[in-house]
From Swiss-Prot:
Protein name: Aminoacyl tRNA synthase complex-interacting multifunctional protein 1
Keywords of this entry: Acetylation, Angiogenesis, Apoptosis, Cytokine, Cytoplasm, Endoplasmic reticulum, Golgi apparatus, Inflammatory response, Isopeptide bond, Leukodystrophy, Nucleus, Phosphoprotein, Protein biosynthesis, RNA-binding, Secreted, tRNA-binding, Ubl conjugation
Required for endothelial cell death: region residues: 101-114
Organism encoding this protein: Homo sapiens (Human)
Region (Interaction with HSP90B1): 54-194
Transmembrane segments: none
Length: 312
């Protein structure tokens, strides 16, 4: 019995010690929470102080700009008295000063409407001249772009390799592909090929891509290029690059040299004007006005079986 009592006492003692330790740990956790909140508050306060300082600086700069503009427009500046507090009996004089300032500003505005000072006229003329120069430059750039012939050289056609293909989550007839076109990151491409090409045949497939169409969303997925195919009302076949092609290889046309547009302007309908002249010939070779799609030093692009068909 004595032994049992001793064991019980030890257990009670250990239990009391455990309670004390738990209470101590609770206090420490509470202190740590308070400390963390305090640190977060201090960080936020510091951040707000920095932002306030920036805002004050911006306000001061804007005030100085406003003062300079008023001076240029002939508005008289009334300095505020320094170190002299305004008392209740000075309200009348304050109102007089304010009304004078308003009158002066409005008179300055009237002068500005009438034509402004000589300096202001010069500044306006300078701005107008700059605007005219900028407009002329933009017109010349647009003119040079429009002066390029509308032919297949405007298209950025490249070899790509489909890394993965999957069905579109919201459209039964569409595939979503990730395609390597020789850039840092693959491009996402949406194609309406579900009814023409089995999914397993899309994986790791070499294709030809039109890469400078403006990216467009297709049922919620942004498509960044278009897979080129031989096409008829009954059938579609993906065009195949020549053996030895690698992602990023350019498609060229001997009779149509030139650099492609960075991005085809949808308003100019350039692709729509070129597409009717894209066909496969009697030997299933892809052509533009009879000139083959070619990868320099590697060969021509072709359809599997579709001859004398459109391409899109």
């Amino acid at each position: 019995m004595a032994n049992n009592d001793a064991v019980l006492k030890r257990l009670e003692q250990k239990g009391a010690e455990a309670d004390q330790i738990i209470e101590y740990l609770k206090q420490q956790v509470s202190l740590l929470k308070e400390k963390a909140i305090l640190q977060a508050t201090l960080r936020e306060e510091k951040k707000l102080r920095v932002e306030n300082a920036k805002l004050k600086k911006e306000i001061e700069e804007l005030k100085q700009e406003l003062i300079q503009a008023e001076i240029q427009n002939g508005v008289k500046q009334i300095p505020f008295p320094s170190g002299t507090p305004l008392h209740a009996n000075s309200m009348v004089s304050e109102n007089v000063i304010q009304s004078t300032a308003v009158t002066t500003v409005s008179s300055g505005t009237k002068e500005q409407i009438k034509g402004g000072t000589g300096d202001e006229k010069k500044a306006k003329e300078k701005i107008e001249k700059k605007g005219e120069k900028k407009e002329k430059k933009q017109q010349s750039i647009a003119g040079s772009a429009d002066s390029k012939p509308i032919d297949v050289s405007r298209l950025d056609l490249r070899i790509g390799c489909i890394i993965t293909a999957r069905k579109h989550p919201d459209a039964d007839s569409l595939y979503v592909e990730e395609v390597d076109v020789g850039e840092i990151a693959p491009r996402t491409v949406v194609s309406g090929l579900v009814n023409h090409v089995p999914l397993e045949q899309m994986q790791n497939r070499m294709v030809i891509l039109l890469c400078n169409l403006k990216p467009a969303k297709m049922r919620g997925v942004l498509s960044q290029a278009m897979v080129m195919c031989a096409s008829s009302p009954e059938k579609i076949e993906i065009l195949a690059p020549p053996n030895g092609s690698v992602p990023g290889d350019r498609i060229t046309f001997d009779a149509f040299p030139g650099e492609p547009d960075k991005e085809l302007n949808p308003k100019k309908k350039i692709w729509e004007q070129i597409q009717p002249d894209l066909h496969t010939n009697d030997e299933c070779v892809a052509t533009y006005k009879g000139v083959p799609f070619e990868v320099k030093g590697k060969g021509v692009c072709r359809a599997q079986t579709m001859s004398n068909s459109g391409i899109k």
